[in-house]
UniProtKB/Swiss-Prot annotation:
Belongs to the aspartate/ornithine carbamoyltransferase superfamily. OTCase family. Transmembrane segments: none annotated. Its main location: cytoplasm. This is Ornithine carbamoyltransferase, catabolic. The lineage of its organism: Bacteria, Pseudomonadati, Pseudomonadota, Gammaproteobacteria, Enterobacterales. Pathway: Amino-acid degradation; L-arginine degradation via ADI pathway; carbamoyl phosphate from L-arginine: step 2/2. Gene3D superfamilies: Aspartate/ornithine carbamoyltransferase (3.40.50.1370). It is found in: Cytoplasm. Keywords: Arginine metabolism, Cytoplasm, Transferase. Carbamoyl phosphate binds at residues 57-60, 84, 108, 135-138, 275-276, 320.
Length: 334
């Protein structure tokens, strides 16, 4: 039976079956091929899409806008300073207003409960562009990228290690994605930065059905041995006070992805992934401040690894657009 996701919200991967997730990845691969060959068919002509960004973004905004334009839709960008959400109007009321004007709504912001409320009351498909807890569109792009760089293999045949802050939205979402798709994931982090135990338990229950393997460890060499992919994210998240940097950098320094970690995988073909932006040199304001304060060349990843043949981060970034397009086409397309 054909998979239909028409009018569905896309709020977190926990809401989707492995078959539905694979369907979205396959659709993204097909849409990417169609765009590259100049044969893309527009299925969102006449659709109006609202993009709500309570947190600013480069990749997510551009990915949604280009994906929408490619498919013939019009977008309205509502930035951090351009809305009354939560100030003069509740999300429940905002959802019901925007749902009368728009055919689909993207939300990037704070608590998962906010996008869940938007999805409950909008009456049109709502897509999670990032919350504090989950980042599902990024995971679709990650899984698609892994498949592209492991030709002939399926997701259950692949393994990856995530190093760093495993309790953030990326650690959470990668664990859910791996559990759903039967993969081998190793979360390599200080124990105080492991995901919430309730989510770990939920993912282990999913893994018992899908065959996924979930490992939590503080040991870098154990965690990265023989993996196909290494993954990390920033150690300091958006909006965190600088006062928190010193302790965070001290705790995370052993989990930096550098040439020693590449070697420890014992896999000369291992690939490096990052959702971006990355602090890999001193060419950003944060990078300069970190180098001056702590003497580090790069934070979560070194320049050497980031710019090496192991790195597939820009393929991964491009695939954000293709997978976001797949979500919109599947849930809203004609």
């Amino acid at each position: 039976m054909a998979t239909s996701l028409k009018n569905r919200n896309f709020l977190k991967l926990l809401d989707y079956t492995p078959a539905e997730i694979q369907y979205l990845i396959d659709l993204a691969i097909n849409l990417k091929a169609a765009k590259k060959s100049g044969n893309e068919k527009q299925t969102l002509v006449g659709k109006n899409i609202a993009l709500i960004f309570e947190k600013s973004s480069t990749r997510t905004r551009c990915a949604f806008e280009v994906a929408a334009f490619d498919q013939g839709a019009q977008v309205t960008y509502i930035g951090p300073s351009g809305s009354q959400i939560g100030h003069k109007e509740s999300m429940k009321d905002t959802a019901r207003v925007l749902g009368r004007m728009y055919d689909g709504i993207e939300y990037r912001g704070y608590g998962q409960n906010i996008v869940e409320e938007l999805g409950e009351f909008a009456g049109v498909p709502v897509w999670n562009g990032l919350t504090n807890e989950f980042h599902p569109t990024q995971i679709l792009a990650d899984l698609m990228t892994m498949l592209e760089h492991a030709p002939g293999k399926t997701l259950p045949e692949l393994s990856f290690a995530y190093l760093g802050d495993a309790r953030n939205n990326m650690g959470n979402s990668l664990m859910v994605g791996a559990a759903k798709m039967g993969m081998d994931i190793r979360l390599v982090a200080p124990k105080s930065f492991w995901p919430d135990e309730a989510l770990v338990t939920q993912c282990r229950e999913i893994a018992s059905v899908t065959g996924a393997r979930i490992t939590l460890t503080e040991d870098v060499e154990e965690g990265v041995y023989d993996v196909d992919f290494l993954y990390t994210d920033v150690w300091v998240s958006m909006g965190e006070p600088k006062e928190a940097w010193a302790e965070r950098v001290s705790l995370m320094a052993p989990y930096q992805i550098n040439q020693q970690v590449i070697t420890a995988t014992r896999n000369p073909e291992v690939k490096f992934m990052h959702c971006l932006p990355a602090f890999h040199n001193e060419h950003t304001t944060v990078g300069r401040e970190i180098e001056m304060a702590y003497g580090l060349k790069g934070l979560e990843v070194t320049e050497e690894v980031f710019e090496s043949a192991h790195s597939i981060v820009f393929d991964e970034a491009e695939n954000r657009m293709h997978t976001i397009k797949a979500v919109m086409v599947a849930t809203l397309g004609d």
